Amino acid sequence: MSTERYNPRDAEPRWQEKWSEAKIFETDNNDPREKYYVLEMFPYPSGRIHIGHVRNYAMGDVVARYKRARGYNVLHPMGWDAFGMPAENAAMQNKVHPKDWTYQNIASMRAQLKSMGLSLDWSREFATCDVEYYQRQQYLFLDMMEKGLVYRKQSKVNWDPVDQTVLANEQVIDGRGWRSGALVEQRELTQWFFKITDFAQDLLDALDTLDHWPEKVRLMQKNWIGRSEGLAIRWEIAAGTGPQGFTDVQVYTTRPDTLFGASFLAIAADHPLAKALSETSSDIAAFCDECRRAGTSLAALETAEKKGLDTGIKVKHPLDPAWELPVYIANFVLMDYGTGAIFACPSGDQRDLDFARKYGLPVVPVVMPRDGDAASFTVGDTAYDGDGVMINSRFLDGLTTQEAFDVVAGKLTAAQLGNEPVAERRVNFRLRDWGVSRQRYWGCPIPVIHCDDCGVVPVPKQDLPVKLPDDVTFDVPGNPLDRHPTWRNVSCPCCGKAARRETDTMDTFVDSSWYYTRFTAPWEDKPTDPAVANHWLPVDQYIGGIEHAILHLLYSRFFTRAMRETGHVAVSEPFKGLFTQGMVVHETYRLGSGANGQWVAPADIRVEDVDGARRAFLLSSGEEVTIGSVEKMSKSKKNVIDPDDILGSYGADTARFFVLSDSPPDRDVIWSEAGIEGSHRFVQRLWRLVSEAADVLRTSASTPAKDGAGRAVSQAAHKTLQAVGADLDKLAFNKAVARIYELLNTLAAPLTQVASGNADTSFVAAVRNATEILIQIIAPMMPHLAEECWAVLGHSGMVSQADWPVFHAELVAENEVVMPVQINGKKKAELTIGRDADQNAVSQAVLDLDAVKAALQGQTPKKIIVVPQRIVNIVV
C-alpha cells in the first residue's frame, strides 16, 4: 500500500507531549536499579542554540536513551550557566535588566532544546542565577572559608579595562581578555582566592585514575599543574653592588646540573629587589612599569620580544665565589612562579640563548648528547635542552645530567651561607591559587561583610542568601554594587556597627564547578543531600568541548575535593568518563575580495556543479561567490546554520542523525546540504518501508528465523544489534549509523516482499523481529521516528520505555573461518570454508584453489597438515 510521507512537524511535537505527560524521563532517586548519570556541559543562555549544541546534546541523549533501554536508572538533567558579562553588556547596550535578558533567553533556548526531543529530566532544571542556587553556593563558600580553603590577599591581577573586571591567568589569551578581546592591564587589588594549590599533588596523582578521559586532556591538566623537582639556591650578592638589606637572591631551578653554564640571573619586575631598585632609579622604575603592562599568559611571554635591564648587581656563583654574574630585570620572568628569579644557562634554554645573544652575554655549552664530541660540540642559534653528558663543568665533566643534578644538590645542601644551607631540595608547582573575585554585578555575591572594628566577617548562614538588588543601573562601566548605598551599607553581624558588604561577586567558573552535584537533589535546603550525591557521583559520562580541558574541568575537580573536605560529598572526582566532541564546521562564502569583500551566509547562496567543479552563486542576483575554506561556524564570517531552520525544514530526527553520522564524534563534522538531505532521505525511506509493510507485520509474531529464507534476515539484524550495542558503548555513533544504513538496505527487499503479501508466516515473523530491532537501535538517535514506527507496528507502549533487544548467540556466530594456506611454510593463499568442515573437505578445498594449483605446478604434495580452524600447510 502507498503511505503518506513522514511528517516531522506533526509527529515530533506529538511524541514530545506524550513523553512529557508520562514523565518518563523524570528520575526517581529511590529507584533500586543501577545508576547511570550522563551530563552534557550546560549552556550559557545567549538566546539561541547553535548547531554545536545540537551535536553535543544529541550525543548525550543517545547515551541517556541507550542506557535507559539497557535497564539503568538514568539521570540526564539540564540547566543554565547564567551569570556573566554578556548579560551586563546587553543591559548597557539595550537598556534591559540582566535578569530579564537572561530569563527571556532561557525561555527561548528551553523551547529550542525541547523541540530536539531530548530525554531530559526538566523537573531538576535550574539556572545559576536563581537565588535558590546561588544561596547554596554562598553556603559552600562559607564552609570553605571555615575550612581554610578561602583567603584574601593583595595581589597583582589581570584587569580587563573594557569589562572592568579581574581575569584569571587562564582567561588571558595572547595578552587579551578571553571575552572582550581587550588588552589586559596589571593592577594591585585585594582579591579572594580558593586554595586549589592545597590539592596540587592529589589533582596530579589522580589523573592516572581517570582511565575514561582523553589522554590529551589529562596531559593538558598535568602540564598546567606543572609539578617539578629542583633546588632553591641562594646566590650571595657581591659586596657593594646591591641595595641595603639584601644579602642574596634565591633562585628555583630544575637544572642545577647546568650551573657551570650560568651566564646571568634574571628577576621579575615585581621582585622585592626590583622594587627596591625602582625607588632610586627612574630607568629601572620605567622598565618595570613596561613589563607590568605586558601580558602574563604563557603565549604572551613566549611571543613577546625578550627585554632586560642590567641592574648593576652582581652575585657570586654558588660553586665558585670568585665568579660573579650580572643580575637583570627581564620581562619574561614572573613573580608568581618559583621565586620570581631565575639563573640563565643560555646553551640549554632557547629563551636564555636569545637573551644572551641580544645582550652580548657568555654562552658556554655544558651538556652534549651522549654520542657527542666534547672538543667540537658548540651551540649556535639553537640551544641544546636534552639530556646527555656534562662538559665544561669542572668536577661534573663526564657525568650524566641526573648524576650531575645529584652531585650539585649534595654539595649545595651541605654548604652554608649565613648559617643557612646554600640550597634545599624543593618540589614546585606551576598551578596557582584560583582568584575568584570579579568586579561586576551579574554574579554570585561573596557572602562577607567588612567592619572597621571586626575586620572581615562571614555572613551568618541564617542570613543567606545575600541577594543581588534589582534596582541597579548600567549607565557607566564598573560594578553597580559599588554605587548602591542601601545594599552596600549594612550593620556588622558581630558588633552591630556600620559596615559594608563585599561588592565583588564570584567568578562564573565557580557556578559551573559544582552544578553537577546540585542536579542530584536540586530541592535540598543545603547544597547537597550527601547520601544522594554520593549515590549519583561521579558523573558516568560527561560530554563537552576540549576548550574546557583546564579551566572548568580542573576547577570542578578541585571543587569536588573541597566539598569532600566540608562534608557535602564523599567522592573526590566529579567525572568518571569524559568525552570531548568535535565542532560543527562549514564552508565560507565571500563576495568580492580585499577590503571590499563581504561574507555571505549559506542560506543566501546556491551551489552548483559546473563542468565538474563546485561553484556558488547569490540567490538574489546570480553573482558568483568565492567558496572559501571550511572553518568553525562564526557570526563574523556568516557561515552559521540556524538550528530552527533545520528543525523546521527537516525535523529534529534528521538533524540529530546527520550530526551523529558524518564523522567520528571526537572530530569536526562538516555541515553540508547534501549531508542533511541524505539523512532526510533515510528517514523517509525507513518510514515508507516500515509503514507499507505494517498491515502485514502487525498481525505477525516477532520471531527470528533459525533456518529457511528468513535466517539471513535474522542474522543481519542480530549481528547489527550486537555491533551497534558495542559501538554505542564506545560512543562510536558514526559507526552505529553506518551499520543502521546497511541494515535498512538489507531489509528493503524483505519489507517490500512482506508488503506485497508474498511471504510465508515464518519469513514475516523474522522480518517483523528484524524491523523491531531496527526501530529500537535507531530510537536513541531518531526517537520520534522510532515511536511512530513502533506504534504503526501495533505496540501500545512507547519504544522509549522498551528494553534494549537481546541478540541471539547462534545468529551472530560466524559459520565460516578464514585459514591461511602455506606451502613448505610460506603463505600462498587463504581458504574460506565452513567452520565444521572435516579434514578431507579442507584438504580438497585447498587443492582446488587457483593460487595453490599455480604454486604446485603439477607436483603432488607429500602430505597436507590441517590444524582445524587455524592453518593448512602443504609439504612438497
Swiss-Prot record:
* One record GO biological process: leucyl-tRNA aminoacylation
What EC number(s) are associated with this protein in UniProt?
6.1.1.4
Motif 'HIGH' region, which positions?
Answer: 43-53
Q: Which GO terms describe its cellular component?
A: cytosol
Q: Which GO terms describe its molecular function?
A: aminoacyl-tRNA deacylase activity; ATP binding; leucine-tRNA ligase activity
**Keyword annotations for this protein?**
Aminoacyl-tRNA synthetase, ATP-binding, Cytoplasm, Ligase, Nucleotide-binding, Protein biosynthesis
* Highest taxon, organism lineage: Bacteria
Q: Which reaction does it catalyse?
A: tRNA(Leu) + L-leucine + ATP = L-leucyl-tRNA(Leu) + AMP + diphosphate
Q: Where is this motif: 'KMSKS' region?
A: 632-636
Keyword presence, Aminoacyl-tRNA synthetase: yes
A Pfam family (short name) is tRNA-synt_1
- Where is the protein situated, by its record's location annotation? Cytoplasm
For this chain, the family text in UniProt reads: Belongs to the class-I aminoacyl-tRNA synthetase family.
Name of protein:
Leucine--tRNA ligase
Lineage, broadest ranks:
Bacteria, Pseudomonadati, Pseudomonadota, Alphaproteobacteria, Hyphomicrobiales
